[in-house]
A protein has these predicted regions:
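TPR-repeat structural position
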Residues: 257, 451-452
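Hydrophobic-face positions in mid-chain alpha helices that act as interaction patches
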Residues: 237, 261-431, 435, 467-476, ...
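Short, surface-exposed recognition loops and adjoining beta-strand edges that mediate ligand/DNA contacts
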Residues: 32-38, 69-77, 163-173, 217, ...
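Sec-dependent bacterial lipoprotein signal peptides
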Residues: 1-20
Length: 573
């Protein structure tokens, strides 16, 4: 059994490697040929399974020898993006300082290479499957093609929003990234300009249309089912409902409100909103799929991200703070003093009656002088009852040394065994799409055309989180007063509901919001307490220099320049 060799798409340093009987790709292309696949039994299925199995778990960028703690797949980009705003605080500066403090973010840096390596590697995998499926795929190849089109759309959707200086609704001509599809030749790659927002989102929607066609049942003129729709066995591969969700996201981005609402509604079918018991589950909270999860990824016990570096190059190490400090002692968040916190102002805007507030340690606990009483208060958050573990996490966070704002939304897996052994505890699942997002998209999209109807939908959703919710008190503008109080209210719900799930910075860009890190009582790190009335330009990711060196048609975004020193304290939001 040999490995498929790596293919360099000029700008991609390391790409997808699959285990199969195929010896090599045609050098002039970015895909395997049909003859190669047909001569390797079962290889098509390997290509399809690799579309999702490579999303997390391996050191795709730097390799296992480097063990980078930001090199663990698609969920790493949640953190890398969202610490650029205000909703996530990174109190001790280390691995994620690049993105929180805007250090070394230019085109010649690893922060530029990282998304290029990952995303174009994933896109190459999609191109392979699309090419191998043929023009008119049948049977299992319909399922494979549908998944490939859906995922390619999702990847380009992320890239478009990360790299475009302006969102679609502001500037349709704003440049995104070069489009590489299943027909792009090596020669094409050398003169491949960045697609405009208009062209990119057209391409994304076309991919999603194809995905919908392949993943839903095929019927004849009489309505008889000729080919059944794709029936997945778990949430770790995209089906038609995920395509509906991706369309809802896309149409929200392009401002096509009716279509956004339509597809968000369709995506909700078959799923159930998380209730308090599920959202605040101390053992399975946000580490195990439930009836609200539409699409997700999971780390496996034999993943390099788990086996190498004590499991510390993984999502669990960054987000799961309940790891026994004496038995295991591992975890960047739990025991190395590098947790991610919720922004204090955002936390304080969450009413006490909203159950989502229970996922974050109350800042008032830091005012308790008696250690025994403090541990007792923290024990209310702990699955194990070990409040002293949470206290330890705060105490070892150099420069912060507090517990207020620590997150326990993303729980350690495996119960007591996982809390004692990170090789079990970090084997978690992470949602990429939840039905709650669809309810919020529907509410915003409906309300953009009929505000009263949108308010009704938003209120109905919010009252599933807080029975005492009253519309109209969460409408801070963050610099952009052109968005209505209703849109601001929708944004606040998204910030709270989807905290840590990779949406914060993308929403800031979509809504053209500023950021506010410096305010009375802030928990943001000194020297990085920046306020901006407009969307920071550092949120426009630079294209890696190797791409612009070899692709002469590709322009770049300006290298981000961080502010010097803290901003004046904000008195309003």
């Amino acid at each position: 059994m040999k490995n498929i060799i790596k293919i360099t798409l000029i700008s991609v340093a390391s790409l997808l490697v699959l285990s199969s009987c195929i010896k090599e790709f045609t050098p002039q292309t970015s895909y395997a040929t049909k003859d190669q696949v047909s001569n390797a039994p079962g290889s098509y299925d390997l290509f399809v399974s690799a579309l999702t199995s490579t999303l997390v778990g391996d050191f795709t960028y730097g390799g296992a020898d480097n063990k980078y703690p930001f090199d663990f797949g698609i969920t790493a980009f949640f953190l890398e993006r969202d610490v650029q705003g205000q909703d996530i605080v990174y109190p001790y500066q280390n691995w994620y300082t690049y993105w929180y403090a805007i250090v070394s973010m230019g085109p010649g840096t690893r922060t530029a290479q990282l998304p290029w390596t990952y995303y174009y590697g994933w896109i190459k995998g999609c191109n392979d499957v699309i090419n191998l499926s043929g023009e008119e795929p049948e049977g299992a190849k319909r399922d494979g093609a549908g998944q490939a089109y859906a995922l390619r759309a999702m990847f380009y959707m992320d890239l478009a929003r990360m790299f475009a200086p302006k969102p679609y609704t502001v500037d349709k001509n704003s440049p995104t990234v070069p489009i590489v599809n299943e027909k792009t030749s090596a020669k094409d790659l050398t003169t491949n300009p960045r697609a405009t927002n208009e062209d990119m989102w057209k391409f994304i929607i076309e991919d999603l249309d194809k995905a919908e066609g392949y993943l839903t049942a095929k019927v004849d003129e009489s309505g008889k089912v000729i080919e059944p729709g794709y029936a997945r066995k778990d949430v770790y591969s995209p089906d038609s409902t995920v395509v509906f969700g991706l369309k809802a996201r896309a149409y929200l981005e392009t401002g096509e409100w009716k279509k956004a609402a339509e597809y968000a509604k369709k995506a909700q079918n078959g799923y159930t909103l998380m209730d308090e018991a599920a959202y605040c589950d101390k053992d399975k909270g946000f580490n195990t799929p439930n009836d609200a999860w539409m699409f997700g990824v999971t780390y496996k016990a034999d993943d390099p991200n788990i086996l190498v570096n004590d499991g510390d190059s993984s999502w669990g190490s960054m987000m799961c703070i309940e790891i026994n400090p004496t038995v295991s002692g591992c975890g960047y968040a739990a025991n190395y003093g590098q947790p991610f916190l919720i922004d204090r102002h955002l936390y304080e805007t969450i009413p006490a009656t909203d159950f989502r507030k229970k996922c974050y340690v109350d800042f008032a606990i830091d005012d308790i002088d008696d250690e025994t009483a403090k541990i007792a208060a923290l024990s209310n958050y702990a699955a194990s009852g070990h409040g002293e573990w949470i206290l330890n996490t705060g105490n070892v966070t150099e420069g912060y040394n507090k517990v207020g704002g620590l997150e326990l939304k993303f729980r350690t897996a495996g119960g007591d065994a996982g809390r004692d052994n990170q090789y079990i505890g970090f084997v978690v699942a992470v949602p990429l799409m939840r039905v709650e997002e669809m309810y919020l998209i529907e509410a915003e999209a409906v309300g953009r055309e009929n505000e009263a109807d949108g308010i009704a939908l938003l209120t109905a959703f919010a009252q599933t989180r807080d029975a005492n919710y009253v519309y109209g008190i969460h409408n801070e503008a963050y610099g952009n007063t052109t968005t209505s109080p209703f849109v601001n209210e929708c944004w606040w719900q998204r910030r709270v509901e989807l905290w840590g799930e990779g949406f914060a910075t993308l929403d800031i860009k979509r809504l053209q919001k500023g950021i506010i890190r410096n305010y009375p009582g802030t928990n943001h790190t000194e020297n990085y307490r920046w306020n901006s009335a407009t969307t920071p330009t550092w949120m426009n990711t630079c294209i890696v220099q190797t791409e612009t060196n070899y692709n002469t048609a590709c322009t770049n975004n300006p290298e981000p320049v961080p502010p010097t020193g803290d901003s004046p304290v904000a008195t309003s939001f």
